[in-house]
Amino acid sequence: MAMMVENSYGGYGGGGGERIQLMVEGQGKAVPAPFLTKTYQLVDDPATDHVVSWGDDDTTFVVWRPPEFARDLLPNYFKHNNFSSFVRQLNTYGFRKIVPDRWEFANEFFKRGEKHLLCEIHRRKTSQMIPQQHSPFMSHHHAPPQIPFSGGSFFPLPPPRVTTPEEDHYWCDDSPPSRPRVIPQQIDTAAQVTALSEDNERLRRSNTVLMSELAHMKKLYNDIIYFVQNHVKPVAPSNNSSYLSSFLQKQQQQQPPTLDYYNTATVNATNLNALNSSPPTSQSSITVLEDDHTNHHDQSNMRKTKLFGVSLPSSKKRSHHFSDQTSKTRLVLDQSDLALNLMTASTR
């Protein structure tokens, strides 16, 4: 005795409908759902191992390339090419995602080389699709391999398995697992933020210390200025230089005049004439000889010269340069001029 029940339902994400065929033979042995059979064939095909293949322990299968899987393989086995719809159908049959970084699914009855275990996999039913309180044919002592059968004309579907919100949230193909995924970039970013926060706090403390030191130095500077302005008397300028100059001037006035015999200073013609003027009582005489360019003595004058009552001797070394470059003046002294006439200094 065999019976077939056709159940069409809307696929998730526009994936189309699925026909569930259940055959009962003898004592009610079930045949796997076509979705499970097709999925097993798709995974077990060695020609597509680069796209989808069994896992390391042959209890899981991995979709290595979801875009190629949806574009090239799904249309060959199903009526759609939507990978999200395929994942949702896996969730309804109790498949779970193993690792978060790749599409690896597992079911305790989906194993390599054990295709007969597919009969133990049943599709989940939500409470909205088949409410439990409105199912008169549901058996309370249901065993997985047995399908309850009553003497009526309707063959009931396997009892629904109500899923909890936590399971629904976990088995969404786009949702992460219960444990949050930790990305290394996020860890590095968090470490950088922590380091920057520590540096910022250290700089803030250093800035506070520097500001306090600056305020202390400003206060010290103001105190020094106040002390100088209020407690230090200004120092009068020293008059030692003026006192020294006046002292030297007085000393020069008190010293008697001296005669420098070896004075080599140049005496102009007017000063020489003033010195040559002498009173008639003077007995000394000076003869002035002028040599022109013809080297002839034209004139010689005997004159007496005194300075403060003292006769001035003359020497041949003493010479006077006039503006006329062609003539020179010479002093000639007689033997009578070598005598010194002493005179009494006048009282002041």
Curated annotation (Swiss-Prot):
Residues 187-232 are annotated as: Hydrophobic repeat HR-A/B. A motif (Bipartite nuclear localization signal) lies at residues 303-318. Residues 32-126 bind DNA. GO terms for cellular component: cytoplasm; nucleus. The hydrophobic-rich region (HR-A/B) corresponds to the oligomerization domain. Homotrimer. This is Heat stress transcription factor B-4. It comes from Arabidopsis thaliana.
